[in-house]
Amino acid sequence: MKHHSLIFLTGFSGSGKSTIGPLLANSLGFEFIDLDREIELTAGKSINRIFAEDGEAAFRSLELRTLEKIGQQERMVVSLGGGVLENDRCFELIRSHGTLIYLKSSPEILTLRLQHKTDRPLLKGPDGRKLTREEIQQRIAELLKKREPRYLKADLVLFTDSKKIGASVEELTRKIERHIRRASKNNTNEK
């Protein structure tokens, strides 16, 4: 059953999910949860260690099980990992249980936000070296091309390139409240 008070934030790494998420949750009076942190707590080890020791299939299985638990909750803002929507089962679970919001940023802005980060595997080459700014932007553009068709199936989209964080949270809060009112009205009319 779809809970309109279960909000899922999606978007590329650096789009603002971890920054906007807790502020949005506070604004709505909801709890905030980061899916990757929940997976780490369940597994008792980091995402990097899960991939290294158990493989991607084990990680994806944990991801789905964690989402199934979260799907039973209400009044929660959930920050999703950048690739979770590529899994069809996860995508359907998210779409059927809550409101999906895409925090959209351009490859150029994402590059500016991410180029000095050292903890992101996507910013390293196959040999482990740090990618150049141009290589980072190219990798982001390639991954966005692959992921964006799913991102764009979100219920709501918020562009995060040039907005201040507070303005983004205010705009998103208004969009969510309107969306929930419309959805509630539609559900009432269907009965």
From Swiss-Prot:
Checking SUPFAM superfamilies in the record gives:
P-loop containing nucleoside triphosphate hydrolases
E.C. designation(s): 2.7.1.71
Principal localisation = cytoplasm
The UniProt GO MF terms for this protein read:
ATP binding; magnesium ion binding; shikimate kinase activity
Question: Which Pfam family, giving just one, matches this sequence?
Answer: SKI
Q: Which GO terms describe its biological process?
A: amino acid biosynthetic process; aromatic amino acid family biosynthetic process; chorismate biosynthetic process
Keyword hit for Nucleotidyltransferase: no
Q: Pathway, according to UniProt?
A: Metabolic intermediate biosynthesis; chorismate biosynthesis; chorismate from D-erythrose 4-phosphate and phosphoenolpyruvate: step 5/7
Q: Which domain of life is it from?
A: Bacteria
Q: Identify the keywords attached in UniProt to this record, alphabetized.
A: Amino-acid biosynthesis, Aromatic amino acid biosynthesis, ATP-binding, Cytoplasm, Kinase, Magnesium, Metal-binding, Nucleotide-binding, Transferase
Q: Which cofactor does it need?
A: Mg(2+)
PROSITE patterns, sorted: SHIKIMATE_KINASE
Task: Give the residues the record marks as binding Mg(2+).
Answer: S18
- Summary of the function given for this chain in its UniProt record: Catalyzes the specific phosphorylation of the 3-hydroxyl group of shikimic acid using ATP as a cosubstrate.
PANTHER family in the record, alphabetically? SHIKIMATE KINASE, SHIKIMATE KINASE 1, CHLOROPLASTIC
> What is stated as this protein's family in its record?
Belongs to the shikimate kinase family.
This one is known as Shikimate kinase
Top-down, what is the taxonomic lineage of the species of origin? Bacteria, Pseudomonadati, Chlorobiota, Chlorobiia, Chlorobiales
Gene name tied to this protein: aroK
